[in-house]
């Protein structure tokens, strides 16, 4: 009797442990599947829309039946018709926990972490306010440059120069940097590397970019002056013309164009006469006979 009671107690304890383990496993799996989701809501959304369907149409007609009798029958045709449809659909809505957000409004997961201050220098926000930095950078927001030359690891055989997010190696006089970019060896200077060529190209591109920006500024200034001149010219033309330019007929435009040519010719003649008169001078500041000086 006692052994049976002990067995019953043991089985009950095992059942409780199995139930507890299964509950923990389900809870852990649910958390892993729904990372960043605090709750889910099922909403009933009413829909109302129009849909097309094939509507039968019965058309009667007369035909000749056996026995030379006239019979009335019908044939069925179909046409496209529209009808209003109303239905309700269930839509699941996920509520994100603090520090998480959805990749798009309709997503059912909240797998994009939020960092109050953006991760810098190629860092990625992997958990709320936690950045995963790119190699060569550290700090909470990946804003601190890691000095590889002071990590205690020998990276260069001679000289190590720290750069932003990386490092470069250098060699003393008489030695050249090897193909690995870290060790130095004796030998003639190697041809320029793609990195040095790229650096020169970048500098040239920078100069060209500055020249292009300067030219763009000059062109913008010219364009502004042309627009101002065009506005003044348009106002002058509208003041001189007997009617708005858009109401002129082709023959009127041709006549005005001819007048403009004649005015330009007369203007050139007047300018020539002014130049000739400016070159004339009288001796002793005296005028010719029959001419009197105005006072």
UniProtKB/Swiss-Prot annotation:
GO terms for molecular function: calcium ion binding; signaling receptor binding. GO terms for cellular component: cell surface; extracellular region. Residues 34-112 form the EMI domain. GO terms for biological process: vasculogenesis. Disulfide bonds join 38-97, 65-71, 96-110, 115-125, 119-131, 133-142, 149-160, 156-169, 171-184. Its main location: secreted. The keyword Zinc does not apply. Residues 202-233 form a coiled coil. Residues 1-25 form the signal peptide. This is Epidermal growth factor-like protein 8. The gene is EGFL8.
């Amino acid at each position: 009797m006692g052994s049976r009671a002990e067995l019953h107690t043991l089985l009950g304890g095992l059942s409780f442990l199995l139930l507890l383990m299964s509950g923990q496993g389900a809870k852990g799996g649910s958390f892993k599947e729904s990372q960043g989701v605090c709750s889910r809501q099922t909403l009933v959304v009413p829909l109302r829309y129009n849909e097309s369907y094939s509507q039968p149409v019965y058309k009667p007609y007369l035909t000749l039946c056996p026995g030379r009798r006239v019979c009335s029958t019908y044939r069925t045709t179909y046409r496209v018709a529209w009808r209003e449809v109303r239905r309700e659909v269930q839509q699941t809505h996920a509520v994100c926990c603090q520090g998480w957000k959805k990749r798009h409004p309709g997503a059912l997961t909240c797998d994009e972490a939020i960092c109050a201050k953006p991760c810098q220098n190629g860092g990625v926000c992997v958990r709320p306010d936690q950045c995963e930095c790119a190699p060569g950078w550290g700090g909470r927001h990946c804003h601190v440059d890691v000095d590889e030359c002071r990590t205690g690891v020998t990276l260069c055989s001679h000289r190590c120069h720290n750069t932003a997010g990386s490092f470069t190696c250098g060699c003393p006089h008489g030695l050249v940097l090897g193909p690995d970019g870290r060790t130095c060896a004796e030998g003639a200077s190697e041809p320029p590397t793609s990195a040095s060529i790229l650096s020169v190209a970048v500098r040239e591109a920078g100069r060209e970019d500055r020249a292009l920006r300067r030219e763009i500024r000059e062109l913008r200034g010219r364009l502004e002056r042309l627009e101002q001149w065009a506005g003044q010219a348009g106002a002058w033309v509208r003041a001189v013309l007997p009617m708005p330019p858009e109401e002129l007929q082709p023959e009127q435009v041709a006549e005005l164009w001819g007048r403009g040519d004649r005015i330009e010719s007369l203007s050139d003649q007047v300018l020539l006469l002014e130049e000739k008169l400016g070159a004339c001078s009288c001796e002793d500041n005296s005028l010719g006979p029959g001419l009197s000086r105005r006072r």
